[in-house]
């Protein structure tokens, strides 16, 4: 979303904006590194489109996915940042067709996709789906079955695109709301400012993850 990208855009220099497939793309430098920010929009299809634009049009050799997300257990805290080690799409289900676990893509043998990690932050498992809700059924699926720590609406789709393209993908999520602590919608809006302050503070470290040379 635009508001999630704003702290990043404020830190960029030599900015030049264009559009691909209706998505805002801002190229420039960030802490001395050439970067491009693709503002995807909400949801898995938007996220996949944005990742493919970065890879095909911008020739990205690495993807950094940044954003706020919901926490699912006591192992995460509001306003804190976490790195994603594995991501699954919890609303993708071929169980009835082939007996695979929920979230297992047709081209994969397991449901969680591994991501590239820098090890600068605590590692967590992410569940992605096109829903923002307080559904008890979703919560049971995410925690009891998938054992996820964090939920969002984009990360798993970006991981899938990067897997097929062979492009390393780092994902960093800042917790805006916690399941079981009242309305996640109210928490989300109340805690956005705190999340953006965390992003500003940690942005240089995050960008450094994508500039480490082998």
Please report, for each region that a protein language model flagged, where it lies by residue.
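Short, conserved "active-site rim" segments that organize catalytic pockets and cofactor/ligand binding
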Residues: 1-12
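Nucleotide and nucleotide-moiety/phosphate-recognizing core
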Residues: 15
